[in-house]
Amino acid sequence: MAPKKAKKRQQAEGGSSNVFSMFEQSQIQEYKEAFTIIDQNRDGIISKDDLRDVLATMGQLNVKNEELEAMVKEASGPINFTVFLTMFGEKLKGADPEDVIVSAFKVLDPEATGTIKKEFLEELLTTQCDRFTAEEMKNLWAAFPPDVAGNVDYKNICYVITHGEEKEEE
């Protein structure tokens, strides 16, 4: 019975792929959680509607259909989890750790402002993956206070994560 289950699961994920060997199990789990957040209708495929919905939850209400189409067309077909993981694997090959983290934030910043809404980031960090505690959120906002519009500079956060100190103002 177990082999049948494994075969069905393999088919549901789009066949077997060595893409899973590119990542550690913990990384795969984190990508799965990100995929689940984006797959708003939970059908196992990321569509334009899923992207529109997740961007709307981040306050990006005026995303053009062409922009969504371009995002979806980066894949050769329907974006299931295996395709999603493969796309990330291709983008991250040989990437600098800071670039990897910035790229992850850029998914949440389609207008390329370099910022993300405080409320949205807090919701993600307290409800997904390794959930932040209230104390951890307090420390984050003390270290990286949002601007008056409630935006957080994620590039500075990425720099500190990878270099351990705050970047000098240019």
From Swiss-Prot:
Give residue ranges for domain EF-hand: 26-61, 96-131, 132-167
Q: What GO terms in the biological process aspect are recorded for it?
A: actin-myosin filament sliding; muscle tissue morphogenesis; skeletal muscle tissue development
Mind telling me which GO cellular component terms the entry cites? cytoplasm; myosin complex
Tell me the residue numbers annotated for binding Ca(2+). 39, 41, 43, 50
Which keywords, in A-to-Z order, does the entry hold?
Calcium, Metal-binding, Motor protein, Muscle protein, Myosin, Repeat
Q: Molecular function terms in GO for this entry? A: calcium ion binding
Answer yes or no on keyword Translocase.
Answer: no
Q: Which Pfam families match?
A: EF-hand_6
Q: Which superkingdom? A: Eukaryota
Oligomer status and interactors: Myosin is a hexamer of 2 heavy chains and 4 light chains.
User: What name does UniProt use for this protein?
Assistant: Myosin regulatory light chain 2, skeletal muscle isoform B
Question: Which taxonomic lineage does the organism of this UniProt entry have?
Answer: Eukaryota, Metazoa, Chordata, Craniata, Vertebrata
